[in-house]
Every structure is written in structure tokens, then in C-alpha cells.
Design a protein with these regions (language model features):
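N-terminal small-domain helix-loop-helix segment of the aminotransferase-like
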Residues: 2-95, 102
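Conserved core of the PLP fold type I
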Residues: 60-168
């Protein structure tokens, strides 16, 4: 992978670059699009090759279960984190926002509060509010150029209605 290669993605239907001006009034030439986790470097060759093998087949129907996919996740969790997980614990969603919305719906009730340490990805608050839950913000402190949790402020902000905390 080459992290030094500059790839201009403007005008390529890139939400990150092409939606900055319509969404925020900032032309792509004048801003740094830090509002979405979308990378501007090419993926590893093995990923590109795997995708090409799939598209070369020429049929794009619904994708079924892939035991290799689940095995890779299980290997990663055990190797990197010492956590042995079962294949049926793995539930794939179509993106972070969908997965977050599903968790908010599954683990909280309307009116419950969900804690967010801010600044954080803006879509989390939108998902929480859309589900009829309350966003409980706990601002992070900026110290020596990095963010730190303020545990005293966190404890002071809690009212007892919180049922979920999202760390990002």
C-alpha cells in the first residue's frame, strides 16, 4: 500500500469530497473533509484481487453466508484480543450507521438516554434522536493536542436514564 500517493476523488461520486459543498457550504478545494471515515488510499492488492474474482463471475445476486469471512473475524478476535467468539455471534450489517441504529433499537427504549463523548461522528446523534432517544453529551477535554475523557464531568452528567454508551 502506498499512503503517499495522492488520489483526487473529486467528481467521482465520492460522498466525502463531492458532498462537502452541498452539505456544509465548503468547496472541496477549500476544506478538509473530516466529516466521514472514508480513506483516500488504494486498498491492498489482495482486496482488489478478491473483488475482481467476484465481479469476473458476472452475476451480482444476493450474497450468501461465507464461512471464510466468519472464520477470519474469529481468528482476528482470538489472535488480537484473546476472545474466542462463536460464528453465530457475528451479525453483519450494511454499514456503521445501520449497525448503530440496530443496537440503539435493540438495547434501549424510547426516552432512554444514550451517552456520546464529543466530538464524535455526527451520524450517531442523528440515529439516537431518530429512535426517540435522548443524546447525553459528555465533552472530551483537549489536553496537549489530544482528547481525554473527563470522568468527573461524565459522572456529573449522568441522571440514571442512560442505557447505552457509545465509544468511538
Amino acid at each position: 500500500m502506498n499512503f503517499d500517493e495522492i488520489i483526487d476523488r473529486r467528481g467521482t461520486h465520492s460522498q466525502k469530497w463531492d458532498m462537502m459543498e452541498p452539505n456544509y457550504g465548503v468547496p472541496a478545494d477549500d476544506g478538509i473533509p473530516m466529516w466521514v471515515a472514508d480513506m483516500d488510499f488504494r486498498p491492498p492488492d489482495c482486496v482488489t484481487q478478491a473483488l475482481r474474482r467476484m465481479t469476473d463471475h458476472g452475476i451480482y445476486g444476493y450474497y450468501g453466508d461465507d464461512t471464510g469471512y466468519r472464520a477470519a473475524i474469529r481468528w482476528w478476535m482470538e489472535t488480537r484480543h484473546g476472545w474466542r467468539i462463536e460464528p453465530d455471534w457475528i451479525f453483519t450489517t450494511h454499514g456503521l450507521v445501520n449497525g448503530t441504529a440496530m443496537c440503539v433499537d435493540a438495547f434501549t427504549d424510547p426516552g432512554d438516554a444514550v451517552v456520546l463523548f464529543t466530538p464524535v461522528y455526527h451520524a450517531f446523534a442523528r440515529v439516537i434522536k431518530a429512535a426517540g432517544r435522548e443524546v447525553r453529551e459528555c465533552p472530551l477535554n483537549m489536553a496537549d493536542g489530544h482528547y481525554e475523557m473527563d470522568f468527573e464531568a461524565y459522572e456529573a452528567a449522568m441522571t440514571g436514564s442512560e442505557r447505552m454508551l457509545i465509544l468511538c
